[in-house]
Each structure stands twice: as structure tokens, then as C-alpha cells.
């Protein structure tokens, strides 16, 4: 079976965006979003390549990475269902990232992408990757999950999501796994309603899924074909291309979204022009006739007319919608979709500006200096992480300091380790270094900005001769909302010579 792609359809009507708050003239520019959904059937990504799945089969890496990926996605959303969630795998997940996220990260890092957020609920996994040039502009990242299995008690079914604000617009990515089997249509509709009723965020203006400027909803939604045809009869109809449109009209998702409008009516979808993606005999592209073939794996989208601003229009276009029959490790075929969206590249949230730092003396105390912009508000759990220059994930920090805990020695008793993915673990190399003195000094400036100095302890373990950078995170705490407020330039770690001393760096 060859890969098929839908013919291009017009984009949905324009709508107007949330009010922009950046400085200067607001202009819209085009960005690309690439969405993946795949029920992997508890299989591991062994002996397979993800290049085709991620649209990289024709892309090579050369010395000029920025030129290479000029037309590549700005955002990847990898949504998987039935990731191996056996108890031993869940325990292992406390100490290392899941194999699927790791494999995607190791491939995408070659093209200058960073894993910025991962959320998992049992076998349901969502991993977000963003091109490095956009990472420092990510605001208000938050993850949420809703269980729908066994009346909302068990997480084998349900949804996980990641939302963030980028260049003045709110984006929500929701991956779902709904109730299975042909006769469970009403249960799937109830799952959808339950997710909407229980999925809430803590970001002003973006409290619910459909509050967002852009919504991407995808996953193994398990909608089947209406009718009493046998599996063999459906397979025979699929062999007749003239019957494709008649079959898709019988698709339950199409009917509840377009006809009865009982579920997903807010979302848009280009109707699949590819064959049904379920159920296959593993290791083949032949249908397993124990189940009737169905388009269970889907990707939908929406753009919302929030906070109207005259003359400015957001838009979205679904540029491709494909299945990938060459992947045969599970009984589902993966589905991908490539979108273009409009964002405001000139919108910048207030943050911090790091002073130049050229050398980090290994074995010494080092002082980091930064300036808080006038409108920037510190969060109660803000922290600064030290990262390798070529970090591939926001979880790759090697050391960190909490800002507010450093200000008062009596408040430095917490052993909580920050995690941008908001799933605390204790295996990270980063450590919170305590001192019985005030390690943070503030100086108010005349322009309502504040100059801040923060000491890092002398036992920060960096590698001699390698480059690093600093990232300031504004955070409300574990499973809270996280924003990137500033990224420093590169600096080199060098071994100290002579007796220990504190090294301070100042603005030139």
C-alpha cells in the first residue's frame, strides 16, 4: 500500500487574534506546525527510523543548519497512544525519558530542535519540540491530563495536553485516546465532553481548550464506520476507489462533527484521502479482518476569534494530511499533518537580560548578573539553569539556583529540584547548592529596572573547555506554569588556578 496524501483544500476562514502586547508594529508572519499521531501498540522504537514519520526523509544536515531547515516545521507535536506503560517501564520513566521521546529528540537535535515539554498519562504521551530560535520566546507552558477510562478512574483512555503562548498567540495541543469498538460511539462522545469539562489551565485568557487562538486535537479517537458491513465487505469496498467518498461519509467522526454536531463541532478536518489506518496485522500492511477497517487515527484543528483586533487576522491552513503505511510495528498506521499558522513575531514578553559572561571558573564561586525589565514580575519558584550550549531538551540542565531562595539563607532548605517538564525526579545532575549567607543582591535602577547578582556555589560540575549558557525560568511550581524569561550568551568553563575565590562578572 503506498502512502497517499489528500489534495489541497482552501484554508478555513480567517479570524482575529488575541490582543497583542509587544512593543512596536505588530505584523503577522507564517510559521509551520507538524503533528504526529500513532498508536504504537506497546512497541518500542527499535530497528526503525523516524525520519519518514517526521518528514525528514528528503532533508539532509549540512554545515549551515539554519539554511537546511529554513522550510522545516517551527513546532513538532508527537502524540502517541499505547506507549508501553507496564509497571517496570513506569519505574524506569522516573529516571530517564521514554524511548520514543528520546529517539525523536536524538534525531531532531541534528536539525536544531529542542524538546520543551513532555506529558504522559500511562500509555498516552505528548512530546513537544520547538526550533531553537523560538525557545526563549515560549511563555506560560502548562500540561494537563484527563482520565476517562472506567468512569474517569483509570488513565488507559483520556487526553493529555500541552499549551503555551508563542509570539502573542495561545496554542493548545491535545492528544486523546477514546473508547474503543464499533458500538461505543456514545461513550466516545461522552469521553470528549468529559475531557472538555475537566481540562483546565491556569493562564489568564486561556483557561479552557477552546480559549486558545490555535487548537490541535489528535490521537486514536477510535471512531468507526456506521453500517453492518462485514470486515471483508469493507475491505472490498476500499479496493474500489470510487467507493472512498461513500465510505468516508459513513465515518462516525465525520457524522458527529458535521451532521449531528454532538462532538468536535468546533474543529475542522480535511477528510482523509488515505486508506483506513486500523486494524492491520502487525509486521504487514494487510488488514486484520478481526476488526472492520476504520479511520481511527485523526488530526483536527481550529483557529479562534478571541479579543478582536481590527485589521489583524489569524489563519491556519492544513497543507498535508497523510498516513505512513511503511510503519508496521503495530496494528495502526501513523498519521501526520503539516500546518501553516500566523503569529506575531514582534511580540516579546518582558523578562531578564543577562550580562555578558565569558568564562566560568570551575571550582570557584561564580556570580551571574542580570537585569530585570520594568514590567517583569518574578514568580515564587523562579530559577536559573546552566545548560550545555548544544542542549537538546529543557531537562538537560547540569546545575541550577532558585532565585528567591538564594535571597534569604533561611529559605534555602528546600531539596526540590526544578524540572521544566514538571514531573519531579531526583536523577538529574543539576543540584541546588546551599550557603549560609545571602547569595542574591539587588540594586534598583532609575528606569524602574533592577540589577540582580546571583552566586552559584563552587561545586557546580562543568566540563573544562566546553561551552554553556544560562536560562531563566519563571515558574509557579511543580505542575504549574513555566515561562522562559531570558537566555544568556555562551560562556566557556575553565579549571581554576590557585586558591579558591569568588569570580564576579560585570557589564562592560
Where are these regions (language model features)?
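N-terminal, active-site-proximal structural segment of metallo-dependent hydrolase catalytic domains
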Residues: 1-118, 124-125, 184, 192, ...
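Amphipathic alpha-helical protein-protein interaction segments
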Residues: 24-26, 39-43, 71-73, 87-97, ...
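Residues that flank catalytic or metal-binding motifs in active/ligand-binding sites
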Residues: 31, 74, 123-125, 156-160, ...
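Short, flexible loop/turn elements at secondary-structure junctions
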Residues: 37-44, 82-84, 119, 131-133, ...
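A Trp-anchored, charged/polar loop motif used as the substrate-binding/catalytic surface
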Residues: 47-66, 149-164, 193-207, 218
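Catalytic lobes of large eukaryotic enzymes
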Residues: 60, 106-111, 174-179, 183-499
Amino acid at each position: 500500500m503506498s502512502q497517499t496524501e489528500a489534495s489541497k483544500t482552501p484554508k478555513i476562514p480567517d479570524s482575529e487574534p488575541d490582543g497583542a502586547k509587544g512593543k512596536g508594529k505588530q505584523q503577522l508572519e507564517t510559521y509551520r506546525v507538524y503533528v504526529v499521531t500513532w498508536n504504537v501498540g506497546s512497541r518500542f522504537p527499535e530497528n526503525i527510523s523516524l525520519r519518514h514519520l517526521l518528514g525528514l526523509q528528503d532533508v539532509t544536515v549540512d554545515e549551515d543548519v539554519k539554511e537546511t531547515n529554513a522550510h522545516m516545521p517551527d513546532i513538532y507535536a508527537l502524540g502517541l497512544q499505547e506507549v508501553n506503560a507496564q509497571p517496570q517501564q513506569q519505574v524506569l520513566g522516573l529516571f530517564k525519558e521514554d524511548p520514543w521521546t528520546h529517539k525523536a529528540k536524538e534525531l531532531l537535535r541534528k536539525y536544531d530542535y529542542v524538546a520543551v515539554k513532555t506529558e504522559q498519562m500511562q500509555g498516552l504521551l505528548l512530546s513537544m519540540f520547538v526550533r531553537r530560535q523560538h525557545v526563549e520566546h515560549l511563555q506560560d507552558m502548562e500540561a494537563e491530563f484527563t482520565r476517562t477510562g472506567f468512569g474517569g478512574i483509570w488513565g488507559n483512555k483520556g487526553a493529555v495536553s500541552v499549551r503555551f503562548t508563542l509570539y502573542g498567540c495561545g496554542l493548545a495541543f491535545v492528544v486523546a485516546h477514546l473508547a474503543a469498538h464499533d458500538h461505543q460511539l456514545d461513550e466516545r462522545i461522552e469521553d470528549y465532553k468529559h475531557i472538555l469539562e475537566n481540562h483546565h489551565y491556569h493562564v489568564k485568557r486561556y483557561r479552557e481548550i477552546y480559549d486558545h487562538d490555535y487548537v490541535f486535537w489528535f490521537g486514536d479517537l477510535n471512531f468507526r464506520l456506521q453500517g453492518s458491513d462485514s470486515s471483508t465487505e469493507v475491505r472490498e469496498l476500499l479496493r474500489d476507489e470510487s467507493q472512498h467518498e461513500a465510505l468516508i461519509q459513513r465515518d462516525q467522526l465525520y457524522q458527529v462533527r458535521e451532521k449531528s454536531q454532538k462532538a468536535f463541532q468546533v474543529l475542522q478536518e480535511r477528510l482523509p484521502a488515505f486508506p483506513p489506518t486500523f486494524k492491520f496485522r502487525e509486521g504487514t500492511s494487510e488488514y486484520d479482518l478481526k476488526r472492520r477497517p476504520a479511520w481511527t487515527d485523526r488530526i483536527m484543528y481550529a483557529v479562534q476569534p478571541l479579543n478582536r483586533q481590527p485589521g489583524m487576522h489569524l489563519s491556519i491552513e492544513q497543507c498535508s494530511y497523510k498516513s505512513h503505511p511503511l510503519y508496521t510495528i503495530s496494528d495502526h498506521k501513523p498519521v501526520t499533518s503539516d500546518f501553516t499558522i500566523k503569529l506575531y513575531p514582534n511580540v516579546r514578553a518582558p523578562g531578564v537580560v543577562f550580562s555578558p559572561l565569558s568564562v566560568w571558573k570551575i571550582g570557584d564561586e561564580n556570580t551571574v548578573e542580570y537585569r530585570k525589565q520594568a514590567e517583569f514580575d518574578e514568580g515564587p519558584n523562579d530559577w536559573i539553569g546552566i545548560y550545555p550550549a548544544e542542549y537538546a531538551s529543557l531537562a538537560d540542565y547540569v546545575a541550577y539556583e532558585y532565585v528567591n531562595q538564594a535571597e534569604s539563607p533561611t529559605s534555602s532548605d528546600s531539596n526540590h529540584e526544578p524540572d521544566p517538564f514538571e514531573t519531579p525526579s531526583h536523577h538529574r545532575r543539576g543540584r541546588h547548592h546551599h550557603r549560609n549567607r545571602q547569595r542574591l543582591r539587588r540594586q534598583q535602577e532609575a528606569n524602574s529596572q533592577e540589577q540582580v547578582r546571583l552566586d552559584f556555589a563552587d561545586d557546580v560540575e562543568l566540563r573544562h573547555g566546553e561551552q554553556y549558557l544560562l536560562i531563566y525560568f519563571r515558574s509557579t511550581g511543580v505542575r504549574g506554569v513555566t515561562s522562559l524569561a531570558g537566555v544568556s550568551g555562551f560562556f566557556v568553563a575553565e579549571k581554576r588556578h590557585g586558591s579558591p575565590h569568588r569570580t564576579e562578572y560585570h557589564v562592560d
